Amino acid sequence: MASGRDERPPWRLGRLRLLPPPPLLLLLLLLRSSAQAAHIKKAEATTTTVGGSEAAEGQFDHYYHEAALGEALEAAAAAGPPGLARLFSIGSSVEGRPLWVLRLTAGLGPPPTAAAGLDAAGPLLPGRPQVKLVGNMHGDETVSRQVLVYLARELASGYRRGDPRLVRLLNTTDVYLLPSLNPDGFERAREGDCGLGDSGPPGTSGRDNSRGRDLNRSFPDQFSTGEPPSLDEVPEVRALIDWIRRNKFVLSGNLHGGSVVASYPFDDSPEHKTTGLYSKTSDDEVFRYLAKAYASNHPIMKTGEPHCPGDEDETFKDGITNGAHWYDVEGGMQDYNYVWANCFEITLELSCCKYPPASQLRQEWENNRESLITLIEKVHIGIKGFVKDSVTGSGLENATISVAGINHNITTGRFGDFHRLLVPGTYNLTALSTGYMPLTINNIMVKEGPATEMDFSLRPTVMSVMPGSTEAVTTPGTVAVPNIPPGTPSSHQPIQPKDFHHHHFPDMEIFLRRFANEYPNITRLYSLGKSVESRELYVMEISDNPGVHEPGEPEFKYIGNMHGNEVVGRELLLNLIEYLCKNFGTDPEVTDLVRSTRIHLMPSMNPDGYEKSQEGDSISVVGRNNSNNFDLNRNFPDQFVPITEPTQPETIAVMSWVKAYPFVLSANLHGGSLVVNYPYDDNEQGVATYSKSPDDAVFQQIALSYSKENSQMFQGRPCKDMYLNEYFPHGITNGASWYNVPGGMQDWNYLQTNCFEVTIELGCVKYPFENELPKYWEQNRRSLIQFMKQVHQGVKGFVLDATDGRGILNATLSVAEINHPVTTYKAGDYWRLLVPGTYKITASARGYNPVTKNVTVRSEGAVQVNFTLVRSSADANNESKKGRGHSTSTDDTSDPTSKEFEALIKHLSAENGLEGFMLSSSSDLALYRYHSYKDLSEFLRGLVMNYPHITNLTTLGQSVEYRHIWSLEISNKPNISEPEEPKIRFVAGIHGNAPVGTELLLALAEFLCLNYKRNPVVTQLVDRTRIVIVPSLNPDGRERAQEKDCTSKTGHTNAHGKDLDTDFTSNASQPETKAIIENLIQKQDFSLSIALDGGSVLVTYPYDKPVQTVENKETLKHLASLYANNHPSMHMGQPSCPNNSDENIPGGVMRGAEWHSHLGSMKDYSVTYGHCPEITVYTSCCYFPSAAQLPALWAENKKSLLSMLVEVHKGVHGLVKDKAGKPISKAVIVLNEGIKVYTKEGGYFHVLLAPGVHNINAIADGYQQQHTQVFVHHDAASSVVIVFDTDNRIFGLPRELVVTVSGATMSALILTACIIWCICSIKSNRHKDGFHRLRQHHDEYEDEIRMMSTGSKKSLLSHEFQDETDTEEETLYSSKH
């Protein structure tokens, strides 16, 4: 049976689509249809009929033809109170029939007397979301036409009688019902026609309009390659589009017939594959939610098995389907609503039979009533509010509302109102409007139920009216625009920078802070670290969502002033900052660039060298190098030449920066010539010759994009007075062809990261005089902008997991014949610069099957190509599990609060997610002193007294001098076991002379308690985590240590002089270590441990012992790197401690044995015997810094400590049970190369793992071993349920085989024994002389046997014998004898 969305592909209809059905077949199908109807009625027997009595009894026995439809709608409107309904027409069909719409919402007032058409609909109501339901788009699909009339009567009469649900609905919702979009087709259709085949040529059946056009293929389509469809043949579609454009519909349903399913966008795809291709929107989760809301309330649809004649085997999981996955529909209405309007529309197939007999109408109404009302109610989910002018307070119409991470914007209505449909989660929303500064609100929580309310107040770019000017008059629906004084550039004339002078460091710092303060909605000022002379290495980020990487948005950087005396790049980047900030929101080019790109501008990489340079310098090297006199552009690792000079702080900072962000394109701004220089910069021979990179064509293209906008550079003869013979065709050159530069930054970017970088020489004079600076801006401003635009060339997209649709981190994208792969970022997003052409691109990832696609790249922007990878071992795993129980891996949960928490963890894991949380913390701390043992004890008791419901204080044991080793648990149920919650411990003070860790843990404890129930993030973390804090492991040593003693070892050991970090062995000798081992580590119920120490600034991971294979190195290093990366300086890998100033620790992370090798360490014991990963954090170079440094140390470590609380909720959490559902505790979970954890009470286990694919083996006594694979995400936990089968094996073999073999063996043994017995019996009855022994009484016989056993010849002779024959004489003789 053909569905209502469109005609099925021929393969779906088979012979029914090609030949008229013979009469006998029609009879069989009608009989089958009757049986199907009986099946449906049986399935619905338990459905309660609600509201049916509200309609007149006679309305279910006929269809509404011609004028009867309008009369029925008028009657429905009359069923409600005055001012509730408004009937109007949006236009006419081909044959002139009106396209009626009934509007239902409270407070409409009396209808206008002279209004007609769309004007008769009445005024819009501020803040009230608009919902439309459209029926009978295909004229022969008639159920929708009828049920919308019934719905109208139900809503109106229900409002009149005071039904609370319907009153609330119509008081808050603007509902529009269009029962028939194709009234002409309806009049041609025939009652009882279930749509089993075509009824004639186009235009003669009821499906199409009167001109033979399918209305659901006549809308503009985003994936169409031809001209947009003409609307002349489809006045119905033209009328609908006009109506949609005049309104801001939020939600819509398109009601069809021919199946029973809810379909959602997209309806087609670029490939237009007939079926089976899931075409996902950016709002796929929302659409699935809406479709499920309808289907779950429909008694047939929710089963997912409509059993429609002709498609009996067709099923839809949960009763929903993606449109294109079902079958491709080009030009459909639901996609048009989503792509070209604010409206989220789904398509609803209401019945198998398109035009069922009128006798079935009551049942169809009862089937769909609850679903229809529920769908309308869903317009109130997500986030709603108003966008207003901060000066006038008027609403801003058509302001854009964007959601970070979702590539689909909506716009505000006439009053500035918006309703953004979203599923539960945490979101960052941005409102922007031309002429206003954009505003972003972060961490907006959306919960199940009514929408979260959030208003935006936007500042105009011109903040006040000039004196003497006339203020603009504001009326509803308009935006106030103040009069602009003469000479002010218009929106088509970009504002040029005015600040042209040399900025020394203090001046540059003020400049950057000023623009960061004036334009907070598009800027973020941050530092990469410090130069040798401790000057900040500033970077200004410019983006419409500063501080956040938006998936799919490329990142770009400019670096200036790498050589301190080459200053033009420094000043141009300051000019560029001013230009971008002042023109955002008014200049289309700048606005589009900032909205689509995350831009990072570093004006000075060498601020120390700059301060030594001299204005007017053309050729000298004064100030070129950094303060350690190293050339920074010879200081990067090189592919051809070993760089022996020590890596400089500025170099380390930049390398850490570039590896932390997904940069796509970059330029390094220099001076001394006028040319764009591209990789490679050197070669193996070290001579000046062309050194081509694999992407030579790309580098030439992006280099030309800069040079051709600079006319002097493009000429190719830059410095005639200085270098007479130097010539660069078109102003570009290969680096090594010009001269060899080993250790250059641009080659390192290309070889070690995804970033393509070129070096741009901006002028022959390195440090020009100040009055020449405007000339440099004028020469380079277009080049700077055009070069940034190159970041949007080539190929972009996402690499996704086919199982759950999530992005795959670090997947590899390879281009055939170009030996330079790139990798994906956290959301699976990638960018690959390419010149126009056709390429074969392969996406691959560990644990997945690679996918290759042919891609054509054009010159007009990047082409988007997504890859969906299937996990490589899925089939093998499924095969291996047959007959042996099973395991399932899933990230889904039906618990709304769990979903909400998962969304929170994902948000906090995003870039700057934790920073936003810390800014929102309602309470923070001011550390000002150290705590002695007595103070520490009182502090902990005070926390327990003030927060008794979330804290529990216990002692693990006592030190040598009988001081308690306190343990504080923070949890929502601290005295109740919750094995399903992850457990994390923070420990400090193992060395008493390093008490900074102790103070940081006390601060962490207080921070969590203070913010509990005051900050939603802290509250959820505490509610879902068991946090154990042990602030002082060595209280005796702490009492002896002295403040401000940075190097002393006093207090390093315990009272027995033992370094406790060498005493964690199986025969621990000290009471402190025994207490920790027995009461903390050996409980084996922790998922993560963080130990704080002092003496440097880095993180170490196991093992500390010198010779030890690190089985789970990837995970341990991942955890250590996570702490370091959230620390402002640790990740730079340069502690700069006085006793080791040249120390370089890549990423701030090192294996313990490489840092300080020793045996008996706490973290080694924790990993080996506690099965818990532990990292050691060294918080400061000074063991015992002054108390005045504590606030700074808390600020540095706070984010890292909190990141551990977030991280403990990732990895894999699972449940192990048997087939009966009984949890199995103490099962062994073996991961990858042998890491072991044990299931807790209730069968729960949790283990942290680095992102990627991991193998899991589960072992339990009496059960068969289970194996599965799980994919771990970087921002969420993966769940796995392992179900065991009872182990019926004996000696490793199946029980049945062992029993069979054993039975056969026993039978053989018994048979053999019998045969031997028989043979022996025969032999024993023979005697050599023909006599045998007389038979005696039983007792005598036993005695004789015993005598025989002696083997005595004498006894043998005393026994009588008889021959083998038993004659009568012998018997007589025997009896007488």
From Swiss-Prot:
Residues 38-1296 are extracellular. It holds the Pfam family Peptidase_M14. The active site is at E349, E761. Residues 1318-1377 are cytoplasmic. The modification Phosphotyrosine is found at Y264. One of its GO terms (molecular function) is metallocarboxypeptidase activity. It is found in: Cell membrane. Its EC number is 3.4.17.22. Zn(2+) 2 binds at H563, E566, H670. It catalyses: Releases C-terminal Arg and Lys from polypeptides. It is an enzyme of class 3 (hydrolase). Zn(2+) 1 binds at H138, E141, H256. Its cofactor is Zn(2+). The chain crosses the membrane at residues 1297-1317. Residues 188-231, 874-898, 1038-1064, 1356-1377 are annotated as: Disordered. The modification Phosphothreonine is found at T1365, T1367. Keywords: Carboxypeptidase, Cell membrane, Glycoprotein, Hydrolase, Lipoprotein, Membrane, Metal-binding, Metalloprotease, Palmitate, Phosphoprotein, Protease, Repeat, Signal, Transmembrane, Transmembrane helix, Zinc. Glycans are attached at residues 171, 216, 398, 409, 428, 521, 625, 810, 854, 866, 878, 952, 975, 1067, 1139. PROSITE patterns: CARBOXYPEPT_ZN_1 (PS00132), CARBOXYPEPT_ZN_2 (PS00133), PEPTIDASE_M14 (PS52035). Belongs to the peptidase M14 family. There are 3 carboxypeptidase-like domains. Only the first two domains seem to have kept a catalytic activity. This is Carboxypeptidase D. It comes from Mus musculus. The gene is Cpd.
